[in-house]
Amino acid sequence: MYSMAFLASSGLVANSSATVFKLNRALNLLAKTVLPDLLTKMSLSCSRVHSSTFSWKCFSKLVDMFFFFFLAWYVRRTTVYPNLNLELPSNIHVYSLDLPYVIYMIKTFQLIEKNFLSSHAG
């Protein structure tokens, strides 16, 4: 899934302006490449009501999109400078205080996906 691959490559755990720089670049990349792809795939999978895998495909895309918007909101909420751009002052950082909440949200999404997949398998 896009969300897990993005998290693994984002460097979210570090508290530095370089981390925010990487997150901002990743969010920009997601907005330009992944999000349109997700919208297209979600549109296609959610329009196939007769398909036996309709629910899972649609749900999976919705979770990915929600994660993207949640992460964008999180980064902007926890930075000193709310309008992120690629040239960041050195005092901008992601606060580690809310990191457990982010991890909790990700684990919750993984659990929901696992349960949903197992209940709609086959």
From Swiss-Prot:
Key words of the record: Glycoprotein, Signal
The keyword Signal appears for this protein: yes
Glycosylation sites: 15
Signal as UniProt keyword: yes
Annotated signal peptide: 1-18
Name of the protein in question: Putative uncharacterized protein YJR071W
Organism field: Saccharomyces cerevisiae (strain ATCC 204508 / S288c)
Lineage: Eukaryota, Fungi, Dikarya, Ascomycota, Saccharomycotina
